[in-house]
Regions:
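SH3/SH3-like beta-barrel fold
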Residues: 119-121
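Beta-strand/loop nucleic-acid-binding surfaces
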Residues: 126-137
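Residues located in well-ordered beta-strands
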Residues: 39, 51, 104-106
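Glycine/charge-rich catalytic "coupling/switch" loops of P-loop NTPases
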Residues: 60, 65-110, 136-178
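ABC ATPase nucleotide-binding domains
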Residues: 1-48
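Single conserved hydrophobic/aromatic residue that forms the stacking wall/gate
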Residues: 179-190
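Short, conserved beta-turn/loop elements at beta-strand boundaries and strand-helix junctions
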Residues: 110-116
């Protein structure tokens, strides 16, 4: 309706899905202070403050993120936020890529959400929540699974930083060096 009429409007809501669907720009406030302004996509992909990182989307806050494979502790950044889409949960033995970056976990909860399953997994005493497509084999509570966490947001008291899993490296990568030789030359293999 707002688009059809061509008017500017302010819409106040606590429903994130509604806000990101109708807004061209979002302003997130915390106790009367503006935490971040931007398009819904900018805010979702680049949360500036710890409050925004924890507020926008579905998140799990983790204190000991350095116990997760591929993530080293950064000084003064004591907590991390992990979103479900940052996690891949596979049945044991079914992870096709980045096996060296994954770790084993135990499923502690499974919730049917209509178009997906939300799966809570305990990894080294840390519980994280990931999503799993209904097209994949079902996973049950108590089952051992492989968990790959691609990235997370770490934060200090004021700012949020995106951290990628340092263990995620392609396996079986080969490097070729090409040498241009203008004259016949003998190459010895060492």
């Amino acid at each position: 309706l707002v688009e059809k009429l061509g008017i500017t409007s302010i819409f106040v809501t606590h429903d994130q899905d509604e806000a990101v669907e109708v807004a061209d720009e979002i302003i997130i406030t915390n106790h009367g202070t503006i935490e971040q302004m931007g398009t819904p996509l900018e805010i979702y992909k680049s949360p500036y403050t710890p409050f925004v990182a924890q507020f926008i989307g579905h998140t799990t806050v983790v204190e000991n993120y350095d116990r997760l494979k591929g993530f080293d502790r950064i000084e003064n950044a004591d907590k991390a936020v992990i979103r479900p889409e940052f996690i891949k949960i596979s049945k044991s033995g079914n992870l096709d890529r980045y096996q060296s970056a994954a770790e084993e976990g135990i499923v502690t909860d499974v919730v049917f959400r209509g178009n997906r399953m939300d799966i809570t997994v305990s990894i080294n005493g840390i519980e994280v929540v990931g999503e799993r497509s209904l097209e994949k084999d079902l996973i049950a509570v108590g089952e051992k699974v492989h968990v790959l966490i691609y990235r997370l947001y770490i934060f200090d008291e004021e700012k949020t930083y995106l951290m990628e899993n340092s263990e995620m490296q392609e396996q079986d990568v080969f490097y070729l060096s090409l040498i241009h030789i203008s004259e016949p030359t003998r190459l010895d293999v060492i």
